From Swiss-Prot:
Gene: adk
Family: Belongs to the adenylate kinase family.
EC numbers for this chain: 2.7.4.3
MF term (GO), any: adenylate kinase activity
Involved pathway(s): Purine metabolism; AMP biosynthesis via salvage pathway; AMP from ADP: step 1/1
Protein name: Adenylate kinase
Length: 208
């Protein structure tokens, strides 16, 4: 099973990714972690990334794709993967498609966790109010104002990507505002319906 999990800040993406990893024996591929590992290992693409990062620049897409390519060749990725943090743009999605095609692999699905932004913001406001009432310090990056900016940034960046995968029949949407267990069940259900993953539901029953 080869998946991309999309969702804005606060959608619970990390929790759901870990559940899928645990129940299906697949790996979570975080571009940040892969970059750091490639740099530490001194691979050719890792050395390229190191030079760029040392100068304070953004790592080019072709270098990131090279690192993903190397990672997909490792034995633990043979059962499948969940990509985390990539792609973020349509050109990156196109490059990923070309990479997978070159390895005779295909992307099974892109799962988007949808959220009600105003409800998310209300949750944060309530939490901040409770912490303030208890005299606890609120982190500067854990405020409604910061979350609002992050949500707007995510929306602007991801909408073209969602359209790209929707056009290709890969996009599956799940309500990320439900309780964690319900979101997990819904992800298993849409995956089973979309790609015929008959063991998704049965293997997912132990989630929790």
């Amino acid at each position: 099973m080869r998946l991309i999990l999309l969702g804005p800040p606060g959608a619970g993406k990390g929790t759901q990714a870990q559940r899928l990893v645990h129940h299906h024996g697949i790996v979570q591929l975080s571009t940040g972690e892969m970059l750091r590992a490639a740099v530490a290992a001194g691979t050719p693409v890792g050395l390229k990334a190191k030079d760029v990062m040392a100068s304070g620049g953004l790592v080019p897409d072709d270098v990131v794709i090279g690192i993903i390519s190397d990672r997909l060749d490792q034995s633990d990725a043979k059962n499948g993967f969940i990509l985390d943090g990539f792609p973020r743009t349509v050109p990156q999605a196109e490059a990923l498609d070309r990479l997978l095609k070159s390895k005779n692999l295909k992307l099974d699905a892109v799962v988007e966790l949808c959220v009600n932004e105003s409800a998310l913001l209300q949750r944060v406001e309530s939490r901040v109010a409770e912490m303030t009432a208890r005299g606890e310090q609120v982190r500067a990056d854990d405020t409604p104002e910061v979350l609002s900016k992050r949500l707007a940034s995510y929306r602007a960046l991801t909408e073209p990507l969602i359209h790209y995968y929707s056009e290709r029949g890969k996009l599956l949407t799940v309500d990320g505002m439900m309780p964690i267990e319900q979101v997990t069940r819904d992800i298993y259900r849409v995956l089973e319906e979309a790609i015929g993953a008959s063991d998704v539901q049965s293997r997912g029953k132990g989630a929790g």
